[in-house]
Amino acid sequence: MWSMCWVLRAHLGLLFWVAVIELCAASGPATIMASDCCENSLSSARLPPDKLICGWYWTSTVYCRQKAVIFVTHSGRKVCGSPAKRRTRLLMEKHTEIPLAKRVALRAGKGLCP
């Protein structure tokens, strides 16, 4: 089951509530915040494919606008990538269990967002 998570973030020394609703796997790793997702981090991480576990996340609101997919490594490190990039799609297809409809959308370059 999915649970709703509200995120409290610190930004430039000021605390404020961020109106971001995240979809978090109930039995998954630690909550992933919007700040954990950065452009090009998948390509800059240079992680070999066998270091990625089969967990993957797709979210609504902020992440979908960025078309971000977050992989969690065996060491617990979070790696973010864009499904629009061929390398990310190949890694996702090889190392995740993706429903057929979303797999077809990925191959067509449509990403995971509706």
UniProtKB/Swiss-Prot annotation:
GO terms for molecular function: chemokine activity. Keywords: Signal. Residues 1-26 form the signal peptide. The keyword Chloroplast does not apply. GO terms for cellular component: extracellular region. GO terms for biological process: immune response. The keyword Signal applies. Acts as a highly selective agonist for human lymphoactin receptor XCR1. This is Protein vCCL3. It comes from Human herpesvirus 8 type P (isolate GK18) (HHV-8). The lineage of its organism: Viruses, Duplodnaviria, Heunggongvirae, Peploviricota, Herviviricetes. The gene is K4.1.
